[in-house]
Each structure stands twice: as structure tokens, then as C-alpha cells.
């Protein structure tokens, strides 16, 4: 365990306005501001993956984080105004950059090619998170080469402070899923005043900063002595960190899936990685999370001379809900419904995150592995009745749902 006992001192220049405020509110004013912060934290040699320092503003969270993890504390960084975010993520290979962006819940290729300045606060938060993780990750080792004790540490202060609580919960779940699933080989400490993300981030330990003279000592004389010292110096603040080991279960994610009209498509159109169009014959479905539309899926009849069936036409998850599997759950629910008609259900995609999921999932069978699609001749189009492939020139993969 790492024991920290921090005495914070700050000299104060006297002024007429300070005296005015002190007189108005009967405040004691000295020439020095003092704070005493104490805490015990797990050491870096211990086998934990995610930690959290939480408490109200001014309770010493940042002071403890700086004292314990100064070298690993992420500092605000500059984003060029005219450079796409994929070009501002460092020198790593593109597959690592897109993989990390997808892991933190920013899985839209259309967003990847935008500059940071035009993104929403939620998207900016995930970009900052992805770049911090990428900068910490080793460049020459694969995930399996690093035991937990040797993985780099990333510490972020004011975690989720600038985003809505819904985005904070979803982003925390996405990050926890990526770290626990060994997709991102780092350890992570969040410093925040928001306790609502604890069950979503699922930390191994939580340090709660509490104001006042609470002591870990059992000796009453020691407690009385400390209390007297605080009363005698009202300009001094005292805070104690209480450590709890835990890994709470993530709250259950309840989705409501409904057949919807195509009128809902404009909400999702600009977030589709390929096209904003929707076929007139598309049958549309949406997943709702906490009564908010989160994901959209559309299917079409799939004409084939031997195995006619259905195919996935569009699959979109809104940026605020990416990273926790809502899109894939909607896709598989819709696929299962169509397979129950006795006809096969196919899906073709070029999105790296979806391809990665379906390759690993027992619910999908690879029909065509990732690669370029050959052009279809006019004779073949006439024989099969199929339109010319729109995925020519792109790396795609085709799957059949077998779940």
C-alpha cells in the first residue's frame, strides 16, 4: 500500500477586498492557506486494473492524484483545428488508432475524419480519452506480453465532468469493457466528483475523500488532539481518504426494441459510416435505452436463385451510446427474428469493429472473409437478379446469422 500524508500550503497576499469579505462574513483570514490530506492507495505492484478517487470539489482528490501518480496524470493537450482526429492521434498504425477509438465508444468513421473542434462535448471527451490511452500504450508489445503489474498507467482528473451523466455512464462502461477484455493494455485511474459512474466503470478500488477530522486511528486521545488542532487553526482544512476494494456488477442494460417507420432514419443518417440513403423497401427497427432512441437497424429481402432470404441494410448506433454493445444486440435480435421465418439472414460490413465482433461471435458464420469484392458482370446480374455490388473497392466481410 502507498501511504500519503500531504500538507498543502499557499501564501495569500492581503488586500482591501479580502478584508471586506472577511468583515462581511466574519471569516478568519491568515497569510497562509493550509490543507492536510491523508490517504492510502494500492501500490503499482498490486494486481488491479481500474481505480477511482472520488469526492466533492475541494476535498483533495487532485492533490492525492498528483502525489501518487504525477508522472501518469494526463495533461490537457492541443488539438489542431484543421487536422482530422485520426491524424492527431500520434504515430501509431491506423488499425491501433481506429481500434482504440472504437473501444472508447467512438466507432463512427465519419467522426474519425473530422477535426476535433467540430465535435460535440461527448465526442471530444472520448477523443481525449482515446489519445491518452494511445500515448500510454507500448509501441512494441502486444497485449498478452504485459502482465497487469507492468501495464502503463493512465490517470485522468475531472473524469466525465464536462459531459452529460448518460454519456458518462455509457463511456465508462465502454472503457471498462475494453480494459477488462484486454483490448487496451493499460491500467486506469479516474479522479472525479461523480459517484454515479462507479457501477459502470467497475473499479477494483475506490478512494472516497471525506472532509473533517475522521481518523483511521482507534485511540480516542489521538482523535481529540487532532480535533483541537483543527479548531485552533480554522484556516486549515483536513481530508481523509477511505479506501474500499470492490468490483461492482455493471447495471443491467435494458433495451426496448420496436419496429419503427422510416421517419426515424434522419436522426441516424449522418452517423452511418457509409451512406445516408435508405432503401424504399427497408423494414426498420430501433433500440431505445432509457426511453431514448439509441440504435437503428434496417433489413431488406435478399433475392437468390438457391437461398433467398434477408440481408442487413443499415446498422447505426448514435455516438452517445457506442461502446457497450447496443448496436450488435439490436442487429442480432433483428437477425434472430428473420431467421425464425425459415430463411437465412446475411450481413455485409466494412466496419472494423463489427467485423471483429462477428468473427469472434458464435452467432455468426463467415461467408466471405475480409477482402475486396470482385465486380459483378452484367450477365451475372441478369442471371441472379442482384444489383451490382456497392462495396467494390472496399474491404468488406460477409456473415450469415446462425444463432
Regions found by a protein language model. Name each.
Residues 1-45, 92, 217, 240-242:
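Pre-NBD coupling/linker segments of ABC/ABC-like ATPases
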Residues 155-163:
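Walker B catalytic motif
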Amino acid at each position: 500500500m502507498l501511504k500519503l500524508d500531504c500538507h498543502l500550503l499557499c501564501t495569500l497576499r492581503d488586500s482591501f477586498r479580502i478584508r471586506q469579505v472577511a468583515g462581511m462574513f466574519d471569516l478568519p483570514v491568515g497569510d497562509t492557506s493550509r490543507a492536510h490530506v491523508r490517504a492510502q492507495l494500492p501500490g503499482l505492484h498490486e494486481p488491479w486494473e481500474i481505480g477511482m478517487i472520488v469526492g466533492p470539489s475541494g476535498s483533495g482528490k487532485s492533490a492525492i492524484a498528483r502525489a501518487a501518480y504525477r508522472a501518469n496524470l494526463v495533461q490537457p493537450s492541443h488539438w489542431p483545428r484543421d487536422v482530422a482526429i485520426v491524424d492527431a492521434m500520434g504515430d501509431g498504425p491506423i488499425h491501433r488508432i481506429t481500434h482504440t477509438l472504437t473501444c472508447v465508444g467512438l466507432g463512427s468513421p465519419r467522426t474519425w475524419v473530422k477535426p476535433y473542434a467540430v465535435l460535440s462535448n461527448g465526442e471530444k471527451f472520448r477523443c481525449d480519452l482515446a489519445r491518452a490511452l494511445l500515448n500510454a500504450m507500448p509501441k512494441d508489445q502486444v497485449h498478452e506480453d504485459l502482465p497487469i503489474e507492468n501495464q502503463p498507467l493512465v490517470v485522468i482528473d475531472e473524469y466525465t465532468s464536462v459531459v452529460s451523466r448518460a454519456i458518462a455512464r455509457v463511456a465508462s462502461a465502454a472503457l471498462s469493457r475494453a480494459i477488462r477484455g484486454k483490448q487496451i493494455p493499460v491500467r486506469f485511474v479516474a479522479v472525479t466528483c461523480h459517484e454515479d459512474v462507479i457501477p459502470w466503470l467497475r473499479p477494483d478500488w475506490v478512494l472516497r475523500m471525506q472532509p473533517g477530522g475522521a481518523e483511521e486511528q482507534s485511540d480516542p486521545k489521538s482523535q481529540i488532539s487532532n480535533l483541537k488542532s483543527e479548531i485552533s487553526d480554522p484556516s486549515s482544512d483536513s481530508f481523509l481518504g477511505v479506501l474500499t476494494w470492490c468490483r461492482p456488477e455493471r447495471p443491467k442494460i435494458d433495451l426496448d426494441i420496436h419496429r419503427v417507420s422510416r421517419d426515424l432514419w434522419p436522426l441516424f443518417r449522418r452517423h452511418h459510416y457509409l451512406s445516408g440513403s435508405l432503401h424504399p423497401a427497408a423494414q426498420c427497427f430501433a433500440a431505445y435505452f432509457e426511453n431514448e432512441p439509441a440504435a437503428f437497424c434496417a433489413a431488406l429481402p435478399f433475392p437468390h436463385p438457391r437461398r433467398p432470404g434477408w440481408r442487413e441494410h443499415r446498422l447505426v448506433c448514435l455516438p452517445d451510446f457506442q461502446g457497450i454493445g447496443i448496436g450488435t444486440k439490436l442487429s442480432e435480435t433483428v437477425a434472430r427474428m428473420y431467421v425464425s421465418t425459415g430463411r437465412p439472414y446475411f450481413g455485409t460490413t466494412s466496419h472494423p469493429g463489427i467485423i471483429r465482433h462477428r468473427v469472434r461471435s458464435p452467432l455468426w458464420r463467415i461467408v466471405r472473409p475480409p477482402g475486396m469484392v470482385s465486380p459483378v458482370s452484367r450477365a451475372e446480374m441478369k442471371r441472379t437478379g442482384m444489383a451490382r455490388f456497392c462495396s467494390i473497392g472496399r474491404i468488406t466481410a460477409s456473415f450469415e446469422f446462425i444463432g
